[in-house]
Each structure stands twice: as structure tokens, then as C-alpha cells.
Amino acid sequence: MEEMEEELKCPVCGSFYREPIILPCSHNLCQACARNILVQTPESESPQSRRASGSGVSDYDYLDLDKMSLYSEADSGYGSYGGFASAPTTPCQKSPNGVRVFPPAMPPPPTHLSPALAPVPRNSCITCPQCHRSLILDDRGLRGFPKNRVLEGVIDRYQQSKAAALKCQLCEKAPKEATVMCEQCDVFYCDPCRLRCHPPRGPLAKHRLVPPAQGRVSRRLSPRKVSTCTDHELENHSMYCVQCKMPVCYQCLEEGKHSSHEVKALGAMWKLHKSQLSQALNGLSDRAKEAKEFLVQLRTMVQQIQENSVEFEACLVAQCDALIDALNRRKAQLLARVNKEHEHKLKVVRDQISHCTVKLRQTTGLMEYCLEVIKENDPSGFLQISDALIRRVHLTEDQWGKGTLTPRMTTDFDLSLDNSPLLQSIHQLDFVQVKASSPVPATPILQLEECCTHNNSATLSWKQPPLSTVAADGYILELDDGSGGQFREVYVGKETMCTVDGLHFNSTYNARVKAFNKTGVSPYSKTLVLQTSEVAWFAFDPGSAHSDIIFSNDNLTVTCSSYDDRVVLGKTGFSKGVHYWELTIDRYDNHPDPAFGVARIDVMKDMMLGKDDKAWAMYVDNNRSWFMHNNSHTNRTEGGITKGATIGVLLDLNRKTLTFFVNNEQQGPIAFENVEGLFFPAVSLNRNVQVTLHTGLPVPDFYSSRASIA
């Protein structure tokens, strides 16, 4: 919580925000501080006069204004809350933090109201103290900026957790400790401000003044004020404008500038932005965790450098002492070089520790602040700051990348003393710098969210650990045989993603990966278990088909442009398991005899399926069918096909059999036995036939029952 305090303090006064308002650039200011840094612009630079000169622009949001006109001399400077001035760097009186500070244009009225509520001079300009964007106020003045109720709630909870003394809300300079609180005005006063702004007379005499602690409790228990529309102060926010990214009321939708914009429900957008902020925080939290581990690593490096330095110096002294008196003259010089290298390494590491510590503290503070903001139940107030917080979180997360978490210095001393020269060559003795042997790479991490299987293919992805400093020259991916057997290499290369095809269906595979470089190989990663699909989904393969084959229906339907038989294969091959697919006859003219079955990848494509020794098929006409392999015709069976008929093909590689079905009835005996190897579904047909393929089908129930009995 302490690191969040920077998020809760005004950049102008340095104190906790009091009645904060939100500028169009998403930064916050105390309302009183905003009045103190107002600048009155000449009449000729007002938005009205600039629009009259013909150089005005339409109502852009502040990001577009920033891009288009922040440094443009012809910019009108008019926006939805006002506009950015065209010359934000105009020199004028400045506070220590570079913010332009001018005294109020008129003294605050001697009333019990805050000076920030007094009228704002016409043609006033305000510069954000953080991004230094200048903004010309419209007729509403500071009332045109929404109040940050969420930030007020976070500050109140923070002060309660710290038991901080409540400060006066009306002190113009350093706020004094409050002595009372007015329950009606909801304002904390010190004694001088109470006497000046809240005298016990007139209508104020009836107000109830209580101790600050009691007032804090009553304020916490009382319902928080609902945020109202800046354009229609009597209306509460009811919807969210997607284009302008801001809450709006119903009057804005009916008659205001949001009437033609896309709007969404306030509650739905509140939940959506909370979800987006939470997701962004998850990424930033991971970065912060890595940063903490990185700092531990850096601090360990300091100790290792100290230890290695001591060890190296001792070795150096021992070698120098062995080279008699002549070595003593060089010993001092060599020790000086070692110490210089030692100090250089320490300086680099300590500088990096300091830099990362500051960045981590800022990151932690932003995280704690965002977590407190998420606890708020004010949708309107939350949506006013959520976009800016989400951008800050993403920006902070990005800043932790780009090599930030990589050590700038190694712990080893890349020096080696060569003590072989003769005594008369001692004056030439010097360090010989050698490259230290590089360690093996760290163990790769399999990225489970990117690993998947499809049909009989598996895609695996991996990465190096985030804190690894040793580069890998490549990776070796290994899979077992799907039956718990030995692992075998399936990929060797530099890529961190690989797709393995041709696996068995309905099988479980174990995968692992290791990295290698010139020094050696890393340990294996954790083993990942992959399950391939139980049934196959596939289509016909245009790449391997005869050129006369015509494809349609996403390659599930085929016919032919020739009167001769032509062969087309399926995209998926089978070498293990039980597989079943069907083909429906969409068109059947002039009683042709198409063939259905399986084939090797190199089957002849310009003749009927089964005429060579690379295919096993059943060809059928309108009356009967035959089985055919290597041009041998067997098992003539009565019963043919017509339009609408269904051909089923059952390939059982566990029992090494091929069986055919016509209209859900087995056609003849088992067609072929002792079939083994890699088979592709296959069809041969001519222009008189059109068939459609149906895949992903379970094995017929009667066959499953018969197989279990057998």
C-alpha cells in the first residue's frame, strides 16, 4: 500500500488529492490546484475568435487533438471539454515541477464554499502538470471536468488504513490539520478556515460541526454521491458512449453531441472494463514477479562476483609468488587490472539493481492502485479512468520487456594467467583474455496453451525460460511411438513451434523437448501427454488426384470430366486402428462401375482402382459387385447401387482386414485380409458418377460387437 501513495498525490501541491477532477488527458488535479494554475488567454486566442477566423476543427477527442493540433499554429484548440492550446510550451511563470502557475484572477469570495467553486475567468487556459498539454476552458470552466469519485474513495480508504491525520480542505498553501467537520457542507476545516469561511451565524449557525474522526466515519457510512453529467448537471449517467469512451446521460443521447453515437449499457461496460483491467493486471503481475526474481538474481550476482574476485585474486597471488622477485613488479599491475574489472562489474550490476528497484516500486504502486480502483462499485467513476489505467498498465508491462530483465554483466572474470614464459620474459607477462566456456542452455518450457492435436497431427510450442541468459542454437523435439515405447527425434532446428503429421488415431503420445548449443544439450522439458482424435475427419486431396477429377463442396464431393476411370485419394492416411467412412452416390448415369477402397500414395491414377498392386477395392454397378486387387477379380456378389445409395468402407488395421457395406448391409465376405502398412481412402469414377464423402463416423455397432466377441 505504501508504494501506491505516489498515485494518490496531486502533482501540483504534492498532497493527497482533494476533490480531484479528471482532465481530458486522463490525468487528475485537485480542484483548487486546477484553479491556481489557470492562465487567462487573450480574447483573440479564445475558441470563439479562432472558430470565427475559419481555422476551427470539429469535436475531436483529446487523442485526435493531440495528434492533429498540439503543435499547429492554426489549431482552434476546441474539444469536448475545451481544447488544447496551440502552443503548450509558451514560457511563463513556473512552479518547481515545471507547471505554469498563476495567482487566481480574482480573490476567493469570503464564503463557506471552496475557492475552487468560484467563477472561472473567461478565456482561461490550463496546462496539465504531467503531460504538459494545454487546454482552453469553455463557458463551464472547471465544472466541465468530471470529478474522480473513485480516486476520492481510494484515498479515503488509504488514509484510514494509515490512520493519517485529516487535513483542512480550504487552506490555500500547506493544509493544516483539521479540527472540525461540517456534516452539512461535508468539508473539513482547521480553526482559522472555520472562523473565516464558516462563521457560527446566519444559516451556518444551524450546521452541525463534529470532530474529524467522527466526520470520517459518517462520510464513510453515507452513500457516495452519484456522478452526474458534465453537460447536464442534474442528470445521472445512464449509458456509455463507445465512440467518445465516456459515460453519458439520456439528454446527451436525445439532444447532445452523442445522439448519433453507438452507446452501450453502463453496467455492461463497467464489467467489461473491469475485466480488461484485471486481465492487464495479470500480465503486469507476472512482469512484477519476474522483476522480483530478477532482483534476487542480481543480488546473488553481487555475492558471486565478490566470491569469484577473491578466488581469482588468491590464484593470481599464488602464481605470482612462484615467479620469484621479478614477478612482484608485475603483480601490482595485474592486481590493479583485476580490481578495476571487479569494480566495473559491481558498478554495472549495482546500477542495474537501482534502476530495476525504482521501476519495480513504480510498477507495484500502480498495481496496488489499480486493485483498489477495481474494488470500487461506482461504474461511472470507474469508466472515467479505466481506459487510462488500462493503457498505463499495458505501457508499464511493455517497459519490462525489451531486455530490461537481462543482466548487463556476467559474474565470471574472463581472464586467465599464462605462467609458462621463461623468467627473462617476465616483463612481457600480461593477461591473456579468453572467452569463458558457455554453459548449456536452460531447459525449454512447453507452452501448454499453444499445444494441440487435430486428427492425427500434433502441434507443439515451447520457449526459453524468461530469465535465461544463455542462448540456444536449436531445439530437439522427441515423441514416443504412441504405445509407451522409446522416444525418437521428430524435429531438430531453431524454430520454437512444430507440427507433427502422420500420427496414429485414438492414440496417446508423450512429447518432450531439449535445447542445445556448442557446449552441449539442456535437460529435457517436462513430458506433455497428447491424445489424437478417436475418429478421422478428412476430405479428398486435390494435390494427389488425377487432373480430370472435379472437386466441390470443400473437396468432399467429386466427379470426373472424362469417360475413363480416374482415381482420387483422401488427405489422411491410416496405419493403425479401426476406421470407417461412407460415400453417397449423388449421380449415377448409364450404369458405370465406380470403385471404392484404399490405396498406397503412389497408386496409378489413370485406371480403375484395384488394377495395380497398390490398391484394394470393390467396384460395383447397378446389379452386382466384385473385389479387385492387382487386376484380380474375386467374390462376385449380387446387389448393386443407384442414385442415393451409400457405400461404407471399414478398414480394421488391428485385425488387418478390409470390409465393404452397401446401404448399411455388409457386401459379401471380408474383402481382404493381411492388409498392413499406410493406406489412404480411395475412389475411382468417370463423368457418369458423382459421390460425396462422409467422415468422422464411428464404427458400426454390429461390427464392434462382433469384434469384441472375437
Swiss-Prot record:
The keyword Cytoplasm applies. It holds the Pfam family SPRY. Residues 273-340 form a coiled coil. InterPro entries: B30.2/SPRY, B30.2/SPRY_sf, Bbox_C, ConA-like_dom_sf, COS_domain, E3_ligase_FN3/SPRY, FN3_dom, FN3_sf. Residues 440-535 form the Fibronectin type-III domain. It is found in: Cytoplasmic vesicle, Secretory vesicle, Synaptic vesicle; Synapse; Cytoplasm, Cytoskeleton; Cytoplasm. Keywords: Cell projection, Coiled coil, Cytoplasm, Cytoplasmic vesicle, Cytoskeleton, Metal-binding, Phosphoprotein, Repeat, Synapse, Transferase, Ubl conjugation, Ubl conjugation pathway, Zinc, Zinc-finger. Zn(2+) 1 binds at C168, C171, C193, H198. Its EC number is 2.3.2.27. The modification Phosphoserine is found at S44, S46, S49, S53. This is E3 ubiquitin-protein ligase TRIM9. It comes from Rattus norvegicus (Rat).
